[in-house]
Design a protein with these regions (language model features):
Chain B
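Ubiquitin system architectures
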Residues: 1-89
Length: 142, 89
């Protein structure tokens, strides 16, 4: 399936320099018999005192239009999701990360929350996984 | 000790191809920034990118490459990053 191959290609194309620098440790999880491919990325946040977060980007057949569906999951058990695994909404909050929004989402180019929830008039265009992760890393550190 | 060369080889890692070239130390950082921007097709969106060294943005692009190199201890092959700035609207 083309959407899956495209997803794998962009994940495999993440630059080792940035992956290593930020300790992202990208990991693909596939669910047999489903149209879902998950990418789990480990993030370290200077803004949150070094807290370790696990971001799950869910690729589905419409990901190139709808965006990569974002959620933070338990870094120790990545099958568990929930608001407790998101950065806090305040004190300190993380710019662009909106755990209190319904649905919780991230306001950065490249993900579902931006292109399908908050700014549905703004197409995915040529946004890239690497560009999104660098922007997210930046707001987690600033 | 003054650098007898008037060029320095710098590497800029970008989200596209990297820059790995000699730069005249008398040129401003803007030249390096523009070269890296070209790789990502960002010439028209300068404000959406940052040139960074050790995670610190080099914001004064009018400074001479040689002056910054001396201050920060750059040598041939020193690596910088060109990264996108978050656009939160």
């Amino acid at each position: 399936m083309a959407w899956r191959e495209d997803a794998r290609t962009e994940i495999d194309g993440l630059k080792p320099h940035f992956v290593s620098k930020h300790g992202w440790s990208p990991r693909i999880v596939e669910h047999e018999g489903t149209d879902v491919l998950d990418l789990i990325v480990t993030l370290h946040s200077k803004r949150l005192g070094g807290r370790v977060l696990a971001l799950r980007l869910r690729y589905q057949p419409d990901w190139q239009i709808a965006g990569r569906r974002e959620a933070f999951v338990d870094p120790d058990d990545r099958s568990r999701e929930g608001l407790e695994h998101w950065p806090p909404a305040r004190d300190p909050n993380v710019r662009g990360v909106n755990p209190e929004h319904n649905p919780p989402c991230i306001c950065l180019r490249g993900v579902w929350g931006y292109h399908s929830v908050l700014h549905a008039d703004r197409p995915m265009g040529d946004t890239t996984l690497l560009g999104f992760l660098l922007e997210l890393q930046k707001v987690l550190d600033e | 000790m003054p650098n007898p060369k008037n060029t320095i080889r710098l590497v800029v890692v970008t989200t596209a191809d990297d820059v790995d070239e000699e730069f005249n130390v008398n040129q401003p950082l803007q030249v390096l920034f523009n070269r890296a921007l070209h790789e990502v097709g960002g010439e028209g969106n300068q404000d959406q990118f940052a040139l960074e060294y050790n995670d610190v943005e080099l914001s004064d692009l009018s400074r001479k490459i040689g002056d910054v190199a001396e201050e920060l201890g750059w040598v041939d092959g020193t690596q910088l990053d060109l990264v996108p700035k978050p656009v939160v609207v």
